[in-house]
Amino acid sequence: MSVSSAPPSATPGFASEVRTTGLLALPLVLGHVSTGLIGFVDNVIAGHHGTATLAAVTIGTSLLWLPMLVPIGTLISLTASVSQLLGAGREREIGPLFRQALWLSLGLSALMFVFLSVVPPLLPTFGIAPDIVPGATAFLHAVRWGVPALTFYFCMRYLSEGMHWTLPTMLLGFGGLLVLAPVGYALTYGKFGFAEHGAEGLGMASAITMWVQASVFALYLWRARRFAHLQLFAHLEGPRWRAIGELLRTGLPIGITVLMEGGLFIVTALLIGRLGSTEAAAHQIAINVAQLCFMIPMGVAEATTVRVGHAVGRGDPQAMRRAAWAGYAIVLGTQALSASALLLGHDAIVGVYTDDVAVAALASVLLLFAATFQFPDGIQVLSAGALRGLKDTRVPMFLAMFSYWGVGMPIGAGLGLGLGWGPKGMWVGLILGLTVASILMGLRFRQTSRRLTATVTP
């Protein structure tokens, strides 16, 4: 097998690869949209119940989802493993691997359950206001019962995505929204014969939604002809530590990487919050818009993981490179559109969020910064997705650590707080951190893919 040195876009199959990746990514993007809408519904229900309820749910969801990034990121290694086995024609190994991933998800959920049990008593030491602590504690104690279902759900989701079937991610995402909205409303406000639980009610509704999503997904995988030959639930072996260890070796660095990136944005928000309510509100608007834009490259990156992994399993380095380049092409196009929309419509976008003149003025400027980091943000997440398809995760973890916490945070804090640039300085740090990450991740993929090509090419 020989690999052409010409750009993959010059090959006849490139347009087909772009189409395949795009179709694979679309349900994933919409699935992320459904997740964002769930957060929106939570805020609306809690906000109308009371300021203390909204604050409690905000604190509770932050303490749930930030550490939850580690198990979710760890389990995503299943996508590349399944995709590579599928590409290699070793589908009989997928069922046993999936069942070991279930054991891993059970262990990870147990750790999360313990975390959510021990954190609430510590909330006062974090400086949380006394009137918020009871609601946040009740929310966390309720939602923790859904964590096992949540990890099982992601395990099944990543299996399905590795098999090139992403539609359930979208359907179950919006299905969860249809469950959460009425149940959350009933339990929070005490409607339809239920007692009023406030913030705890939203935690209960979230846990119920998690179990409904996981149960429906399991039933679908059990009954669907598409997965029948995998015999996913034919039997359950005991834990096989070698297989679980392999999933951990590949997946844990992903979980840590995702945690470091999420931590960068959360710490940035906390530091900006120290500057004043106007600065905090403006930053929240800008970062919310940026997160909406990020859903597209994130979905494309997940699809690229699948396509790259499948090509690696087939032993086809040319297809692997073509899959990666297709992902880059889509992301560059979508990020160009996002950046253009932010540059041309930043004032109008801010107007949807607030009527406060001071907040709007600063948020409008920050959206210009958000437009600037569209390209590095898209490239870094796409490169990380392509590297996951190669099962190259350990070095990217250190690259992310350096980029976000060795470059982005020190520069942002130095400019924003040290030199008095305020939120603008913090956003410069975000841009530089993401830019360095995009360069290093891109170079790492180039190096790793070339090494893989050399091992396959005679």
UniProtKB/Swiss-Prot annotation:
Locations listed in the record: Cell inner membrane
Keywords: Antiport, Cell inner membrane, Cell membrane, Ion transport, Membrane, Transmembrane, Transmembrane helix, Transport
Membrane topology qualifier: Multi-pass membrane protein
Presence of keyword Cell membrane: yes
Record-level GO cellular component terms: plasma membrane
GO molecular-function term, one example from the UniProt record: xenobiotic transmembrane transporter activity
Residues passing through the membrane, by range: 21-43, 58-80, 101-123, 138-160, 167-189, 199-221, 251-273, 288-310, 323-345, 360-382, 395-417, 427-445
Biological processes, Gene Ontology terms: monoatomic ion transport
Pfam families named in the record: MatE
Location, primary (coarse class): membrane
Function: Multidrug efflux pump.
Family label: Belongs to the multi antimicrobial extrusion (MATE) (TC 2.A.66.1) family.
Name this polypeptide is given: Probable multidrug resistance protein NorM
Organism: Xanthomonas axonopodis pv. citri (strain 306)
